[in-house]
């Protein structure tokens, strides 16, 4: 069982990461070469951990980076929330000890608040801020009804003004994340992406669904390809990148400079290193069930070390334990936990149960 006394996130990764096939020390994006153009850095380091609200906290980002992600994004951060000084909002952009750097995603509708937020985030993070991304893709009604997120795709002039406001304020690159369009059947992504690039966006991430689809149906990678053909800035492909092979296929089939992995990383931080192996012409090693349990334990220790709410571990259990024997039982056990010690007790029991099951199989074959 992992120690519950480790306090530093960097110490947790150094102690537990290598044992589960993860890096014990995290490197900065593109080796920290901030002086190089973003296009070059993305081309050489194309595997990105997507921003996900309620998911990509510091512990999750560190697991993804340890699993091979070249760069990880914050959860989407409200410009208004930063303006009004909510400490909970500011916590979303904080970088934990051992986390080398961060891409911060902002959302809102007011250019002046975007300029202020970008400047404040840049001051707070300093050299650890890689880029500012503007969310123009979130399909959630409580966001779009305010004209934010994917609703901005119906107000391109306003969207362009947000890009210009940020680009005119900070020295780091400003990028955008968009969808195929807001409403089913109304594809605007290629032209919209051109307008954002003209306004100063140095890269465009494209999710191949309409906002009205949410995450239903299939992402259309053809629209990603059309955006690649429409703009002169790097395009980052997103949508239905569920495993390492799909990450490699996105790059090969669409011509994108980089690929953004979201739900495919659930319980699978190795997706990035596996994709890198495929891109290098090598077959990735499979991940054993025991290694997944150990990685869940590592992730829980990172949650504790970064001061995150440990109830997030209940979702993590669903993801890491998916497909295991009696997974529903073990998920139920995890759902009863609220402290690190309780979670680690469950993983210890699970590990013993797996060892006993293996021993029984071996005895049956003797």
Task: Tell where the protein language model's regions lie, with residue ranges.
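N-terminal small/glycine-rich loop or linker at the start of catalytic domains
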Residues: 36-48, 83-101, 138-148, 167-175, ...
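Active-site beta-loop-alpha junctions enriched in small/polar residues
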Residues: 52-54, 77-79, 107-109, 137-139, ...
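Glycine-rich, positively charged N-terminal anion/phosphate-binding segment
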Residues: 20-41, 52-127
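Hydrophobic faces of well-ordered beta-strands that scaffold small-molecule active sites
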Residues: 47-51, 72-74, 102-106, 132-134, ...
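Alpha/beta catalytic cores of nucleotide-metabolism and tRNA/nucleoside-modifying enzymes
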Residues: 1-43, 47-48, 53, 59, ...
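Alpha/beta enzyme core
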Residues: 115-148, 155-233
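Active-site mouth loops of central-metabolism enzymes
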Residues: 45-55, 102-114, 152, 177-189
